[in-house]
Amino acid sequence: MRPVVSTGKAWCCTVLSAFGVVILSVIAHLFNTNHESFVGSINDPEDGPAVAHTVYLAALVYLVFFVFCGFQVYLARRKPSIELR
């Protein structure tokens, strides 16, 4: 199997996706626990767990991108490079 994207783009996507998964998971957890700073104001949503569910789904999308891009990095590293003699 051949990689779909270049190695540099795959690494960039992998790092950004990992960051997205971590940040969105933390935000979703804070909504799920009805943290004061996320649901305590007048303009904030009242149903924290419903918002947390949506944010967890967004983190899942980032996780899929993380797996895909990580697999692209694996494929690029596995491919033998050209050797000059």
From Swiss-Prot:
GO terms for cellular component: endoplasmic reticulum membrane; fungal-type vacuole membrane; Golgi membrane; proton-transporting V-type ATPase complex; vacuolar proton-transporting V-type ATPase complex; vacuolar proton-transporting V-type ATPase, V0 domain. The keyword Transmembrane helix applies. The chain crosses the membrane at residues 11-31, 55-75. InterPro entries: Ribonucl_Kappa (IPR056552), RNase_K (IPR026770). One of its GO terms (molecular function) is RNA endonuclease activity. Residues 32-54 are cytoplasmic. It is found in: Endoplasmic reticulum membrane; Vacuole membrane. Keywords: Endoplasmic reticulum, Membrane, Transmembrane, Transmembrane helix, Vacuole. It is a multi-pass membrane protein. One of its GO terms (biological process) is proton transmembrane transport. V-ATPase is a heteromultimeric enzyme composed of a peripheral catalytic V1 complex (components A to H) attached to an integral membrane V0 proton pore complex (components: a, c, c', c'', d, e, f and VOA1). Accessory component of the V0 complex of vacuolar(H+)-ATPase (V-ATPase), a multisubunit enzyme composed of a peripheral complex (V1) that hydrolyzes ATP and a membrane integral complex (V0) that translocates protons. V-ATPase is responsible for acidifying and maintaining the pH of intracellular compartments. This is V-type proton ATPase subunit f. It comes from Saccharomyces cerevisiae (strain ATCC 204508 / S288c) (Baker's yeast).
